[in-house]
């Protein structure tokens, strides 16, 4: 199977290319924090030679509680994104939830993301595809890896073949997620070789059945990320925070920003090793 390459400026995203780090924070908490987090990622990835894309949401529209922080909104969020691009020269990925958001967001950022809970909403998928932007599709927690092929087809039917697929875990009973490492190759096959990335942060979520916010398993972020890269994928999706215990969203799953360099260094070593192996022919 031929691996497709999705280009984001001078970055090649493909399953057989060096992994790309899609890293940042869960939600924009402030302009200053976004600058701090982005600068930390840029310094680490430039030092280690890892391709990098900044990620954050301007609106967490699917929070469990009506009282939870959602973000600064689209208008203010896009101003922050533009400043990050102007200051650090980074590429940016963010999610959209409404049809009217698609074009204005695509005019500023480099990748627009289709949220997992909305991935089968055809009108939204079509509106995103018609912007011509690169699209990152989050696999819904309730969908099998093979079913991602249908979402890819919707996007391609609109004339857009710049597609990245992202696994963020699968429902395992109530209030728990697991990651099927065999699912990455299934998604590659279902999409005829599209780049597949792994959202290690959100795969660590663990819900409190009676609570208003998700818990998480931060202590296992390294082992889960290592496992994902070991199967040969295009990138990792990671959230880090200066103080995860004070984060306004998903802090229990976020990597401490102080641990970023050690984490990325390990991931690069694993990715380099895995992609140095020749592909084995196991057919009969």
UniProtKB/Swiss-Prot annotation:
Disulfide bonds: none annotated. SUPFAM superfamilies: Aldolase. This is 2-dehydro-3-deoxyphosphooctonate aldolase. The keyword Transferase applies. It comes from Haemophilus influenzae (strain 86-028NP). It is an enzyme of class 2 (transferase). Its main location: cytoplasm. It is found in: Cytoplasm. One of its GO terms (molecular function) is 3-deoxy-8-phosphooctulonate synthase activity. GO terms for biological process: keto-3-deoxy-D-manno-octulosonic acid biosynthetic process. One of its GO terms (cellular component) is cytoplasm. Keywords: Cytoplasm, Lipopolysaccharide biosynthesis, Transferase. Its EC number is 2.5.1.55.
């Amino acid at each position: 199977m031929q691996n497709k390459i999705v280009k984001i400026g001078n970055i090649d995203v493909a399953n057989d290319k060096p992994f790309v780090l899609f890293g940042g924070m869960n939600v924009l908490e402030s302009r200053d924090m976004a600058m701090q987090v982005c600068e930390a990622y840029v310094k680490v990835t430039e030092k280690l030679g890892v391709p990098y894309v900044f990620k954050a949401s301007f609106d967490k529209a699917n929070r469990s509680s009506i009282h939870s922080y959602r973000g600064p909104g689209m208008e203010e969020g896009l101003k922050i994104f533009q400043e990050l691009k102007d200051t650090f020269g980074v590429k940016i990925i963010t999610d959209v939830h409404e049809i009217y958001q698609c074009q204005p967001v695509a005019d500023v950022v480099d990748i627009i993301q289709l949220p997992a809970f909305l991935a089968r909403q055809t009108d939204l998928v079509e509106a995103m595809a018609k912007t011509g932007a690169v699209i990152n599709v989050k696999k819904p927690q309730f969908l099998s890896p093979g079913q991602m092929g249908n979402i890819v087809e919707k996007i391609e039917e609109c004339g857009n073949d710049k597609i990245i697929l992202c696994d963020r875990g699968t429902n395992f009973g109530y209030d728990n997620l697991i990651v099927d490492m065999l699912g990455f190759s299934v998604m590659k096959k279902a999409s005829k070789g599209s780049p597949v990335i792994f959202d290690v942060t959100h795969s660590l979520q663990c819900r409190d059945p009676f609570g208003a916010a998700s818990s998480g398993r931060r202590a296992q972020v390294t082992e889960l990320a290592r496992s994902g890269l070991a199967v040969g994928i295009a990138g990792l999706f990671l959230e880090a925070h200066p103080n995860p215990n004070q984060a306004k969203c998903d802090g229990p799953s976020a990597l401490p920003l102080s641990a970023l360099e050690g984490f990325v260094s390990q991931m690069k070593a694993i990715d380099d090793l895995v992609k140095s192996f020749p592909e084995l022919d196991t057919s009969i």
